[in-house]
Every structure is written in C-alpha cells, then in structure tokens.
A protein has these predicted regions:
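The tetratricopeptide repeat
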Residues: 66, 103, 110, 146, ...
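Structural signature of tandem alpha-helical TPR/SEL1-like repeats
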Residues: 82-88, 117-135, 156-169, 190-203, ...
Length: 372
C-alpha cells in the first residue's frame, strides 16, 4: 500500500508558506525515488537553488537523487551544451534508478528539446522519447508529466483526438502543472495556434519562472506575435537574469538588435557566441544576424557552409536562412519537403516574421483561389 506524504515548504526567515504538496510513495521502492520527488519540488519552487554532488558510499539513495537533481538543473538551463549534459545524466539515472519515473520523463523532454533546436535527428529523437515515456507510464500510468509528453508527441503526429484526451487527463491528475502547460503550449505553437500557445505559456511561466525552456518558448512566441520592441524587452530581461551566458537567448537578442539597426550591439552579442560549425537554431540565428549586418559580403560564406551540410537531413530552423540566401524558389522546395517529412517546424514557419513576405504571398494566392 502506498504512503501519502504531505510536504510544506516554508521560508526559514519569514516563516511564509511557499508551497504544499502531497506525494504518493510505495515503501517497497528505493528511497531515491522519494528523494527525487522532493528535490523536484525544491528545484521548481526555489530560484537558483544549487547543490553539489554528494560523494558518499553510505548514502547511495541520496546520491542517486542528487544525480537526478543535477540533470534537472542542466535541463532547466536550456542551452545546447546543458541539454546534452542533462541527457547523459538522465541516461545514468534510468540505469541506476530503473523504477523511478522522473528521469524517464526528463530524458524524453531532453530528446524533444534537442530535436527542436536542430541538435539531433528528429525522427530518431521522437522515437527514443516515446520509448522513455512508455517506460514511465509502465511504472506509473497516472504520471501527469509522462501523459503530457505523450499528448505533445501524439499532437505532433496529427493524432489530435488522442492528444486532447491525454492533456485533459494530465491536467486532471495534476492541476496547474507547469510542465503540462509547457508541453501543451509547445504543441499549439508548432501547430501555428499562437494565441492559445501564448496563453498556455503564460500559465506555465507563472508557475515555473526558473525553467529557461519555458521562457525561451515565450520569447519566440512574442517575436512571432507582437511588436519587436516587446520581444526585445523580454529578451533583455531574460539576459539580465542569467548570470551565465545562454547562447540561445544571446543569438535571438543579437538578431533583434540587427533587425532594429543596432549593429554595434548585435556585433557585441555575437562575440559571446561560438563560431558556427553546424546549422542548429543558435547558429542559424547567428548567421542570419551576420547577413543583416554585413549583407552580400558574407553571403558566399553562408552558402559554403550550407553546401557542406546535407540540408535534406536538417530541420525547419534553417528555412529563414535558405530564403534569405537562395530566394523563394529554393525555400518553397525545402518547405514542401519538410511538410512531407512532418518536420516539427513545418506548420509554424509561415508565422516567422523573417518569412512575412512569403506568408503574404501565400495568403494572396489563397484569396484569389477563393474568389475564383
């Protein structure tokens, strides 16, 4: 029979109640499973919490829980490198804690995040994520995070009825879960339902302001839906909150500055980024910014980089760069291929302000066809 533990998180100085939650725990499971759940609450509710890894053979359960916490914090930072580190940590977690659902869910989220950013092959990442989610649900069929992740992936596969049921069930099991709101917002964004995506991400960020992936999704939605100054203001706020440079935010902010004509500020931000060796989300933003600053003089360099990469294997984040360098014809060819491949970005690309002229042209064609 499960134990139900009631936990209250109270500020030591003010004695103010920060949060209270209940946790169901099977006493037959290792203590590390319970500790991971407690640590989950601490990470979500205490800004900038930081624990060092514990080197002790006397407390293996605590050591496993701290390993999970370190992975969770790397995932929260949401940089290309931190997500890769988190992936390695969570793989270790599921091998040492195979009965714990939390690392499986985080492992799945890392795979999806890396695929979204163009840092891993999408189909393989989604397949691996599904395997992790199914394992989590095998252990605990009522895990709201796993159900939310499965709702996200089902929606990405156009299984919308299944997706809606899974999200509804996840919300019922854990009302006001920042993770479930985040997954649902991400699905709405990728499907082009930007208004609903924004409402959901606002709910998520209000509950979990420390998870950078949530904030970055809000930033991208703002860029797609609001005046550029609004997105810049939010990006500057995020940048000031980060003691460590986040290359994703930096690359977006550099692009914003170049779009506004603030080339010196854009150049200063570009200096904080690593040289482009691939075509992930950060590198594409960096190259696009350089094109805005330097124009035709850098076009050949970008084309050489594109020529050295198999563009049939990359995802939709590169399309604005292809449109800028090669023009509409090549863009349309790549976009149609991405639609056939069910690329994660294929449905939302026309909302990208960098592709506004293409969107307007397609809308005009649609109006003409309707009139005919």
């Amino acid at each position: 029979k499960n134990w139900r533990l009631f936990i209250e998180l109270i500020h030591a100085r003010t004695h103010k109640l920060i949060d209270h939650q209940s946790i169901d725990f099977n006493p037959d499971n290792p203590l590390s499973v319970l500790l991971s759940q407690v640590i989950n609450i601490l990470i979500e509710k205490i800004p900038n919490i930081n624990f060092k890894s514990i080197n002790t053979q006397q407390m293996p359960s605590l050591d496993s829980a701290v390993m999970y916490m370190n992975g969770r914090m790397e995932m929260y930072r949401y940089t290309p490198e931190s997500l890769k580190r988190a992936l390695v940590i969570f793989r270790d977690c599921v091998s040492t804690q195979p009965q714990n659902t939390l690392p499986y869910c985080c492992l799945a989220e890392c795979h999806i995040s890396l695929a979204l950013l163009g840092l891993s092959e999408q189909k393989q990442a989604i397949t691996t994520a599904v395997t992790s989610i199914e394992k989590a649900l095998e252990i605990n069929p009522s895990n709201s995070q796993a159900l939310g992740l499965l709702g996200l992936i089902s929606g990405l596969k156009d299984e919308h009825s299944v997706s809606n049921v899974l999200f509804k069930q996840a919300h019922l099991l854990k009302p006001n879960s920042p993770d479930v709101y985040y997954y649902q917002s991400l699905l709405c964004f990728l499907n082009g339902d930007l208004a609903r995506a924004f409402n959901l991400i606002e709910k998520s960020i209000a509950l979990e302001p420390n998870k950078m992936g949530i904030s970055i999704l809000k930033l991208i939605i703002l860029y797609y839906t609001s005046p550029l100054d609004n997105a810049i203001s939010f990006a500057l706020n995020l940048n000031s909150q980060n003691t460590c440079n986040n290359p994703i935010i930096t690359s977006i902010l550099a692009m914003f500055m170049a779009l506004k004509g603030h080339n010196d500020k854009a150049k200063s931000l570009l200096l904080k980024l690593e040289p482009e060796h691939g075509l992930d989300y950060t590198c594409v933003n960096s190259l696009y910014t350089k094109f805005l600053i330097y124009g035709a003089s850098i076009k050949n360099d970008i084309m050489k980089l594109l020529a050295n990469i198999n563009t049939n294997k990359i995802n939709g984040v590169i399309l604005p760069l292809i449109y800028t360098v090669y023009g509409k014809k090549e863009y349309e060819k790549r976009w149609q291929q991405l639609i056939k491949d069910n690329d994660l970005w294929s449905n939302v690309l026309l909302h990208d302000p960098r592709l506004l002229s293409v969107k307007n042209e397609f809308n005009t064609i649609g109006v003409m066809r309707t009139s005919a």
